[in-house]
Each structure stands twice: as structure tokens, then as C-alpha cells.
Curated annotation (Swiss-Prot):
It is found in: Cytoplasm. SUPFAM superfamilies: GroES-like, NAD(P)-binding Rossmann-fold domains. The gene is tdh. Binds 2 Zn(2+) ions per subunit. The lineage of its organism: Bacteria, Thermotogati, Deinococcota, Deinococci, Deinococcales. This is L-threonine 3-dehydrogenase.
């Protein structure tokens, strides 16, 4: 089969021929239809410090996809050949304290599809059946292909009550924009998103945010106070950028008793005003991945109740043009980029 693999310890991704993997007794063999390029894949492509420490070479990469069940292990129940599926990319151990307590998203022994085990940028993927999510018929393939990052957005956005609240999202990458759209969909009063990339702020506007702010050109607090009538600060903060200055600004503009969910990963140490955290009595919660599988059920329900993610998908390429897809991601002038394994 064809696959995209990190073949060498340098920048780049390579198309290779490799054997079709064999499912174990508890696994599904999934024929991949479409995949999406994640920021993690870009880190691996660029071979940055994190990738060098984390990724064994060679490794088939990718973890955002939609496909159909091609074969099943002998012990698999609840699936049929031909079922349309996506899947949870965090493969957990099942025997640690958190797994046994039903908190699998907190497993200390998690392996990542396309990171520590073979990924979904391939014609076929083997995945534990436990990790597969059977897709409703009314969720289109393009949207299903981005369910993994959508799950990050949903997990982050729904960490706190949003109904009637003023929400600040820092970072207008695809996950940040989707988190902002979730907040609007479930009833937040104002949803403000900040970034320094005008292209992605325009995507956020298309997804329905109340206000998109380029912090190099406008003052965030002036916009909130003078345009939106906010006098006390934001109630909920969703930090999606990994930017130290963005996080510091978020802490500064939160209302007393505000709640912050952190998904963005900083590249180094970040300084914030801990006195503000204490005296404002802020709650800060770290987010990683998706809750298994509560987040997945909520994702499907949000789409089925009318949340439209299609504007965040900006590019489509046949798999033979994968390099163009990575170039689009690297440019910063894209939303989600779809690679189609059925289009050569």
C-alpha cells in the first residue's frame, strides 16, 4: 500500500510503499478515504525539537481521517465491514488507575496514532476497535475527516459553562476557530478571538465570531469595552495559541472568578502574573486530546444540531499532491487541508 512516512531525520515527508498492516483479534483494519493535516504533522514535517525527541524513524504519520472498515479481528463486536468510521488517536493502556476508573483521556501510558504507532496517512490503518467511532450517515466525509481536531476544540470549549458568558479565544488556528464556533453555537453571549494572522481571523469571521481582533492593530480591551459593552472582563478564556503574550493578556482581561482552559502548547517557559490569578480567583485547566468518548458524542450532536464546520476546510488535494497540502499548511494561509486517498 501507499503511505506517507517520516523516512529520514530531517525536514520532509515521503510517499512509500509498505505492507498492508494485519489487524489483531481486537482490531479493525480501516481503509482510509480522506485525511487532514494537523499541526502535529507540520511539526513532524519540519523536524523541530519536539519531533526529534518524540518520533521514531521511520514512522507512518497522520491521525485525522475518515474511512471504512475493511476487515475485523476475531474478537471484535459492534462493527461490520463497510461501516464508516473515524477514530480516537490516543491509544490507552486500559489497566492504569485512570483507565480503570473510566478516565482514559488521563492515561499515563497513552500512545499516539501517527506519533508512537503507525498513522492514518496510508491506504490502510489498524486501530483497536475500542478506539473507533461509528459515524452517523448525515455527517459528511470532509467534516468526519477533521473530527480529531474538532474534538480538541469541543473538549476545550465545553470545559466550562458558556451559556450567556463572554468568551475570549486566543489563537485563530483551525482548532481555535472551531472552539469559537462551538461557543457561539451553544449560547455564549460574546465570542472574541485574537491572533496576528489576518487570513485566519477572516476564517473566524466566516465561522460567526462576535469580533475578531488582530492584536498588532487593535487594543483588545478597548474593543471589548467600547464596542461590546463589556465592563468587567471575560468570563471564560480558551487559550489555543501557545503564545506567552496571548496567555498573559488573557489573564489580564479576565473577570474575577473567570475560568481558563489551556490547549495551546508553549514552545518554552511562559511568565504570567500569578498575583492576578490569585486575587481574581481564576480557575485554570489544562486540556489534552478528547474525553473518551463523551467528547465524540458531543461532536456528533453539535454537527447534527446545525454547527457548520465547512468554512474551516479551505484546501483539498489528491494524495499524490500531498506536498502541496503541506506547503499550504506551512504558509499560514490555510484552514484545514484535506488529502483524498481516493483521488490520485
Amino acid at each position: 500500500m501507499k503511505a506517507l512516512s517520516k523516512q529520514e531525520s530531517r525536514a520532509g515527508i515521503w510517499m512509500v510503499d509498505t505492507e498492508v498492516p494485519r489487524p489483531g483479534p481486537n482490531d479493525l483494519l480501516i481503509r482510509v478515504k480522506k485525511g487532514s493535516i494537523c499541526g502535529t504533522d507540520v511539526h513532524i514535517y519540519k523536524w523541530d525539537e519536539w519531533a526529534q525527541k518524540t518520533i521514531p524513524v521511520p514512522m507512518v504519520v497522520g491521525h485525522e481521517y475518515v474511512g471504512v472498515v475493511a476487515a475485523m479481528g476475531s474478537e471484535v463486536r459492534g462493527f461490520n465491514v463497510g461501516d464508516r468510521v473515524s477514530g480516537e488517536g490516543h491509544v490507552t493502556c486500559g489497566h492504569c488507575r485512570n483507565c480503570r476508573a473510566g478516565r482514559r483521556h488521563l492515561c499515563r501510558n497513552t500512545l499516539g496514532v501517527g506519533v508512537n504507532r503507525p498513522g492514518s496517512f496510508a491506504e490502510y490503518l489498524v486501530l483497536p476497535a475500542f478506539n473507533a467511532f461509528k459515524l452517523p450517515d448525515d455527517i459528511p466525509d470532509d467534516v468526519a475527516a477533521i473530527f480529531d481536531p474538532f474534538g480538541n476544540a469541543v473538549h476545550t470549549a465545553l470545559s466550562f459553562d458558556l451559556v450567556g458568558e463572554d468568551v475570549l479565544v486566543t489563537g485563530a488556528g483551525p482548532i481555535g476557530v472551531m472552539a469559537a464556533a462551538v461557543a457561539r453555537h451553544v449560547g455564549a453571549r460574546n465570542v472574541v478571538i485574537t491572533d496576528i494572522n489576518d487570513y485566519r481571523l477572516d476564517l473566524a469571521r466566516k465561522m460567526g465570531v462576535t469580533r475578531a481582533v488582530n492584536v498588532t492593530k487593535e487594543d483588545l480591551w478597548s474593543v471589548a469595552r467600547n464596542e461590546l459593552g463589556m465592563t468587567e472582563g471575560f468570563d471564560v478564556g480558551l487559550e489555543m495559541s501557545g503564545s506567552g503574550p496571548a496567555f498573559a493578556q488573557m489573564v489580564d482581561v479576565m473577570n474575577n472568578g473567570g475560568k481558563i482552559a489551556l490547549l495551546g502548547i508553549p514552545s518554552g517557559d511562559v511568565r504570567i502574573d500569578w498575583n492576578a490569578v490569585i486575587f481574581k480567583m481564576l480557575t485554570i485547566k489544562g486540556i489534552y486530546g478528547r474525553e473518551m468518548f463523551e467528547t465524540w458524542y458531543k461532536m456528533a450532536a453539535l454537527i447534527q444540531s446545525g454547527l457548520d464546520l465547512r468554512p474551516i476546510i479551505t484546501h483539498h488535494f489528491g494524495i499524490d499532491d500531498f506536498q502541496q497540502g503541506f506547503d499550504a499548511m506551512l504558509s499560514g494561509q490555510s484552514g484545514k487541508v484535506i488529502l483524498d486517498w481516493e483521488k490520485r
